[in-house]
From Swiss-Prot:
Self-association and partners: Homo- and heterodimer with other ZFHD proteins. Interacts with MIF2 and MIF3; these interactions prevent nuclear localization and DNA-binding to inhibit transcription regulation activity. Binds to ZHD1, ZHD2 and ZHD11. Interacts with HIPP30. Interacts with KIN10, KIN11 and FLZ8.
Biased composition (Low complexity): 281-291
SUPFAM superfamilies on file: Homeodomain-like (SSF46689)
Site (Required for DNA-binding): M274
Tree of life domain: Eukaryota
Acidic residues bias: start-end ranges: 190-199
Gene: ZHD3
Protein name listed in UniProt: Zinc-finger homeodomain protein 3
Amino acid sequence: MEIASQEDPIPINTSYGNSGGGHGNMNHHHHANSAPSSLNITTSNPLLVSSNSNGLGKNHDHSHHHHVGYNIMVTNIKKEKPVVIKYKECLKNHAATMGGNAIDGCGEFMPSGEEGSIEALTCSVCNCHRNFHRRETEGEEKTFFSPYLNHHQPPPQQRKLMFHHKMIKSPLPQQMIMPIGVTTAGSNSESEDLMEEEGGGSLTFRQPPPPPSPYSYGHNQKKRFRTKFTQEQKEKMISFAERVGWKIQRQEESVVQQLCQEIGIRRRVLKVWMHNNKQNLSKKSNNVSNNVDLSAGNNDITENLASTNP
């Protein structure tokens, strides 16, 4: 019993060359792993052509089994350049204590000792530390993040953001210089809705009103109401304050309430008025009383002298 005769060989048939007839069912089985895009791949595989592949026949089955052995050629690998750090001119300000700006003119850092020693951190020209010199790195890609040199941003008049397949217009913050005493009309009202829906499914953000200028606070605030007193009210308040010693006592609460009802003011107004006028009016009343006492004493002295002299 021959086992080999019972095994059917796997048909690997292809029509390689000029085939004049039509192809039947073509089954392409690609078992090769995909190679990276940065690699150039060359294939070297002999094509197995069967003896009965004449390129003709209606039901001729072409099955390409690409079991390919790859010869990989690596070409696009970038070699990293060695990073070289250099220290250029000295930037130390020798006149910083005097509020000026003066540099020593050293153009490049020159170490004072061998590499790895402490002396290697000191410049032999200007005797300054290495950190005072401008550092320059070679072999390193430089990236600049500047808001003024960004070519990938849309123009500042209209900035759009992607938000779940919708375009959102986002206005830029506006810097407003407001004159003294001028504020926006919407600054005192509540802020409106920040988002409203427009046509086309887009969303627009409304910028809230800017805060008022700090110079306008003193001009737009309401003036504090100042109570004006009549001459009669002033006289009664002065006499009461002199009687209680310019200080309201708790035991005199009934007298205070009676005075407030009589002259038509509130207790707090009377208390504030006594506090504000305590120094000035109390001194004036003391001076007047002293002058009255002195004049009365002088009159007594003159009367005594007149009685003694016949």
